[in-house]
Amino acid sequence: MDNELRRIRAIAEYQFGPGSGMALFPDEVRMVYSRNTGRIRHIHLGDALIATFRPNDGVFTLTIAAAEHLLAKAPEFGYTVTVTEDAAQFVSQGKNVFAKHVLSAGEKIRPGDEVIIVAEKSGVVGVGKALLISDEMKAFKIGVAVKTRRGSETDA
């Protein structure tokens, strides 16, 4: 097995928990390297960009394609935030998630974690960075819970 593939799977396991490395990065992934540093920058599955490696903190940012792929392979994924259908239309346009619209959140979520935003009925609507722990997301009625990085309608 390729050392780089083992490395990105290990990072995913650290970031998202056991089993996520293989679920997110199967053997068919293709890595794109930075021209300046020669390090991994983007990971593609087929023609779709699924993750970008952030060298400043050593973790991945996900795309909508990665979120859908990950939830299909690992439905018990612990880094999901479920929002109301009313909020889902705005989140899919790239708007932030407010705490009052959060129905449930994975117990492992901490501020700064990469999370998948799902609507209660319509599936993945975005990905972003958690700003609160999971208990606060469910308890608070004001404030931003997740800073949306990509909405399902805005992700190209």
Predicted regions and their residues:
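Basic/polar, acidic-poor N-terminal "presequence/leader" segments
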Residues: M1-N3
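Beta-strand/loop-dominated core regions that host nucleotide or nucleotide-derived cofactor-binding catalytic loops
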Residues: R6-V29, R35, L45-P111, V115-A156
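Terminal interaction modules at protein C-ends
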Residues: R39-I40
